[in-house]
């Protein structure tokens, strides 16, 4: 996207002259929406991000959260929507590679990946093409680099047919003493390591800062190299303690990396582009500055520690060059064959002006009068929905056991559980959630719902939530309704984080998610990280023969934005479920008090109580007889009781359990009753086939 007239004038005034071609490329890339957050950062500053256990929050490539004395976890989320729309295989693969490198910047070893994927209807040929190639790209990269994909969330909606939302989260672990030590000083070297620069991904950040109109240039999409990605992991593991700082070379290329490094350390940089190792010797300096060639890191290292880093790079056969160093002063200098092609003050380089767009609120469509449908047919429709169905066809393509750290695997529970071998039975619990329908109807309440859903998933498995990262994906901010959606979503996240006392330590905003003038439904994904003291006590979403079944929490008549409303009545209307933060916090305490004494548990969410019970039966391979009318509720309609998506609820199973007993697990038939009336009956195997994507 071209610089605006006002931005060009600001650059001319800041430089005191006309910018060079290389400087124009520098600013076009680094001042793009994708890199500068110029339309969003004013609002993002409002998000709460601090807590005693947060070692490093927002503002650098990756945060750090202390989960045990001297043991840190880093996790971060990234979007790769535009590239995945044009080249879904490489778009998804490079999204995974990029988020892994972000985690490497704090010296952490990547231990897990999660993905939040939003596609068009699976029966649509184009959506199916994107879906298949995105999943293959994630699978191929994750499997080859040796980082397991342990969970995520998948959503299908017409809005994402041509504009998918592809989000990747990486979790890494690092001992406190292994974090790069900082203390950057003049004379320290900038070592660029990884693939040689070429023209791949040229202008990728500018490409991600405009809407899709069809016929986009594939050259803006980067190409992944998981073998080199794995080598960089090995180098960081071996030489991370030798260096002072690590920076990912991602969006914006060298332009953004140099601007951020200079700004973070308040030092000048002298960088010789002609000393950079390249694969395309015909590339012009302005192209090398903004190239987004993948699998590259910048290591900041002192002259005396350079041999330690070089030894590791040579051992793993990673190409590298030493084209830059920190210098006194406040300018970024880039040299090319003896000529200074970039000479920019730090304050200007990292000083993209903020933009505030007009906002236009709207009200969601009112919930219409709904006829009560035949319940057996309604149950089949909801349970077979792609948004409720089990996603075995996706996660079975991932090697989720590589590294043997996955204690609760995809499909087994509400969240992934990872064992931390550094600390006995201590583990991490992590889950990401989003509901674009909710955030379309009410962006503020929808964002809060995404937060509490991920929080509750972590809690029900047995984790104590510690921190969160978020990803907000909307259309063009130049549309007043879209900009209002974004601002409202931030307010919802701020409220949820503050009320739940879970800091937001990082995030990503992706704008211009449109195709041919049509914005996607605003999509707010929240990934919550928690800790569990004993992974062997984690709750899976299943029961055993003879278990009693319990429901905790009250079902209210909240079907606005529900899967039932869309699937059975073809309507998207009403308000999303209300959020009771006290009830959500209570779930943490209740589950902790029962930890190790339950067979299993699952939260109640999309598809309502009916979907939660059916999931438990299918996961277990054991049927049940359940009287849903025993569940605590204030509704008078059976369809609302079955399909309401009220928050603050979960299902548990065991000899005893929290909440109200509603049935018993036994046999191979799943029966739903209301008192003496049979509402639904399916053999578990039949139910399993019905619920497969």
Curated annotation (Swiss-Prot):
Instruction: Name the residues that bind ATP.
Output: 37, 76, 470, 507
Biological function: Part of the phosphoribosylformylglycinamidine synthase complex involved in the purines biosynthetic pathway. Catalyzes the ATP-dependent conversion of formylglycinamide ribonucleotide (FGAR) and glutamine to yield formylglycinamidine ribonucleotide (FGAM) and glutamate. The FGAM synthase complex is composed of three subunits. PurQ produces an ammonia molecule by converting glutamine to glutamate. PurL transfers the ammonia molecule to FGAR to form FGAM in an ATP-dependent manner.
Name of this chain's protein: Phosphoribosylformylglycinamidine synthase subunit PurL
Give the coiled coil ranges: none
User: SUPFAM superfamilies, alphabetically?
Assistant: PurM C-terminal domain-like, PurM N-terminal domain-like
- Give me the residues that bind substrate, please: 79-82, 101, 222, 292-294, 510
Classification via InterPro entries: PRibForGlyAmidine_synth_PurL, PurL_linker, PurM-like_C_dom, PurM-like_C_sf, PurM-like_N, PurM-like_N_sf
User: Among the entry's GO cellular component annotations, what is one?
Assistant: cytoplasm
> Where is Mg(2+) 1 bound in this sequence?
78
Biological process, per Gene Ontology? 'de novo' IMP biosynthetic process
GO molecular-function terms, A-Z: ATP binding; magnesium ion binding; phosphoribosylformylglycinamidine synthase activity
Supply the alphabetized keyword list.
Answer: ATP-binding, Cytoplasm, Ligase, Magnesium, Metal-binding, Nucleotide-binding, Purine biosynthesis
Pathway(s) served:
Purine metabolism; IMP biosynthesis via de novo pathway; 5-amino-1-(5-phospho-D-ribosyl)imidazole from N(2)-formyl-N(1)-(5-phospho-D-ribosyl)glycinamide: step 1/2
Chain's gene name:
purL
Q: Which HAMAP family match?
A: PurL_2
Q: What is annotated as the active site?
A: 34, 80
Nucleotide-binding as a keyword of this entry, yes or no, is yes
The subunit field of the Swiss-Prot or TrEMBL record says: Monomer. Part of the FGAM synthase complex composed of 1 PurL, 1 PurQ and 2 PurS subunits.
In short, the EC number is 6.3.5.3
Q: Where are the transmembrane segments?
A: none
């Amino acid at each position: 996207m071209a610089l605006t007239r006002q931005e060009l004038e600001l650059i001319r005034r800041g430089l005191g002259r006309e910018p060079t071609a290389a400087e124009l490329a520098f600013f076009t890339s680094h001042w793009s929406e994708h890199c500068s957050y110029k339309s969003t950062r004013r609002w993002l500053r409002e998000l709460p991000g601090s807590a005693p256990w947060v070692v490093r929050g927002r503002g650098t490539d990756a945060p750090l959260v202390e989960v045990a004395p001297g043991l840190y976890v880093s996790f971060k989320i990234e979007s790769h929507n535009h590239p995945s729309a044009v080249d879904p295989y490489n778009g998804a693969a490079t999204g995974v590679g990029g988020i892994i490198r972000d985690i490497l910047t704090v010296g952490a070893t990547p231990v897990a990946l999660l993905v939040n994927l939003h596609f068009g209807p699976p029966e649509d040929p184009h959506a199916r093409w994107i879906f298949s190639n995105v999943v293959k790209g994630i699978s191929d990269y994750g499997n080859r680099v040796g980082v397991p994909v342990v969970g995520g969330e998948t959503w299908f909606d017409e809005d994402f047919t041509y504009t998918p939302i592809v989000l990747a989260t990486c979790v890494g672990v690092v001992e406190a003493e292994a974090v790069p030590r900082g203390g950057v000083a003049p004379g320290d070297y900038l070592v660029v390591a990884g693939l040689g620069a070429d023209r791949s991904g040229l202008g990728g950040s500018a490409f991600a800062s405009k809407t899709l109109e069809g016929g986009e240039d594939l050259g803006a999409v980067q190409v992944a190299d998981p073998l080199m990605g794995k080598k960089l992991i090995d180098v960081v593991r071996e030489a991370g303690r030798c260096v002072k700082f690590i920076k990912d070379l991602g969006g914006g290329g060298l332009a953004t990396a140099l601007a951020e490094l200079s700004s973070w350390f308040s030092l000048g940089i002298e960088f010789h582009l002609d000393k950079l190792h390249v694969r395309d010797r015909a590339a012009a300096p302005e192209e090398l500055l903004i190239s987004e060639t993948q699998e590259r890191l910048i290591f900041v290292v002192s002259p005396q520690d350079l041999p330690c880093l070089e030894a590791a790079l040579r051992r793993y056969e990673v190409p590298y060059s030493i084209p830059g160093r920190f210098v006194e002063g406040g300018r970024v200098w880039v040299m090319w064959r003896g000529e200074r092609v970039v000479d920019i003050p730090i304050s200007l380089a990292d000083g993209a002006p903020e933009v505030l767009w007009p906002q236009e609120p709207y009200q969601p469509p009112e919930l219409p009068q709904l006829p009560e449908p035949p319940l057996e047919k309604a149950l089949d429709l909801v349970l077979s929905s792609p948004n409720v169905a089990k996603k075995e066809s996706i996660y079975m393509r991932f090697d989720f056991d590589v590294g043997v750290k996955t204690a609760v695997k995809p499909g087994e529970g509400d969240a992934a559980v990872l064992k931390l071998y550094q600390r006995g039975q201590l583990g991490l619990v992590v889950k990401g959630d989003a509901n674009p329908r909710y955030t379309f109807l009410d962006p503020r309440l929808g964002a809060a719902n995404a937060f509490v859903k991920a929080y509750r998933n972590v809690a029900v498995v047995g984790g104590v939530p510690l921190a969160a990262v978020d990803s907000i994906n909307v259309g063009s901010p130049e549309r007043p309704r879209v900009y209002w959606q974004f601002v409202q979503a931030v307010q919802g996240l701020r409220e949820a984080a503050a009320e739940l006392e879970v800091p937001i330590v990082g995030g990503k905003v992706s704008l211009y998610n449109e195709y041919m003038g049509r914005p996607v439904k605003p999509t707010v994904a929240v990934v919550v990280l928690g800790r569990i003291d004993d992974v062997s006590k984690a709750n899976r979403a299943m029961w055993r023969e003879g278990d009693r079944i319990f429901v905790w929490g009250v079902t209210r008549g909240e079907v606005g934005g529900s899967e039932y409303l869309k699937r059975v009545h073809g309507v998207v209307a009403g308000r999303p479920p209300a959020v009771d933060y006290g009830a959500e916090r209570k779930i943490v305490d209740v589950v902790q008090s029962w930890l190790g004494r339950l067979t299993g548990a699952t939260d109640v969410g999309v598809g309502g109580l009916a979907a939660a019970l059916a999931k438990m039966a299918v996961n277990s391979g054991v049927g049940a007889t359940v009287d849903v009318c025993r569940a605590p509720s204030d509704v008078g309609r059976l369809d609302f009781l079955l399909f309401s998506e009220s928050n603050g609820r979960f299902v548990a199973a065991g000899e005893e359990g929290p909440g109200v007993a509603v049935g018993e697990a036994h046999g191979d038939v799943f029966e739903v009753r209301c008192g003496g009336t049979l509402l639904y009956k399916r053999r578990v195997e039949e139910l399993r086939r019905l619920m497969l994507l």
